[in-house]
């Protein structure tokens, strides 16, 4: 990032010189005919569940959420106003009261280091636990080629860690922020339910306290088209 003057990670795939990290290791249990689910263990809050085929928690997005198959820039993978901790010990609860609605909540170690098991930072030293709550609505708009899936998410987060104020007046604890993440398929090439060719759009917005966060607000918009070139049905342009 320093070489190109970018505030965000220019390549979210690059993780340094380490050869391997254990990203997640957890116990998972479903309840109520799979309408409720809980995970306990080492968890990654940026990649948890799906609902109606859409990312269900947290700050998910169907068209801008995967640095391996979509955009490389970190700000188009997750909202940079959200201070997600490294994968570490935590609890995630995901509930789907209806087919078109979900609620997700999590508490995780704010001091986590992905290179460790998580026990050192979670149970020794400051009791800093990052919390996040999200709800999403998943409408399907009618079209001649079948339903057009959308996802409209809103969430808030809480970070108890002390942060230095930029004006030098001390530190602040109990930081809070809000975010939105939206994606919508607007055009399908054919009626096959298993065929994802077509155009999808996305948008994100987030806000955080400017006195302790470098990014006080953020927005992004974009889209992707799969199968734009005839006979190249799996190619994606973003």
Residue ranges of each PLM-predicted region?
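Extended hydrophobic secondary-structure segments that form protein cores and membrane-embedded regions
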Residues: 1, 39-41, 152-158, 198-207, ...
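Outer membrane beta-barrel
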Residues: 1-110, 213-222, 226-238
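Short loop/turn motifs that connect adjacent beta-strands in outer-membrane beta-barrel proteins
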Residues: 32-35, 100, 140-151, 187-199, ...
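Outer-membrane beta-barrel pore domains and translocons
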Residues: 43-45, 108-110, 155-161, 185, ...
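Surface-exposed beta-loop-beta
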Residues: 110-181, 188-192
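Non-catalytic alpha-helical scaffold/packing segments enriched in small hydrophobic residues
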Residues: 153, 177-184, 202, 218-223
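Active-site-proximal binding-pocket segments
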Residues: 174-176, 189-219, 229-233
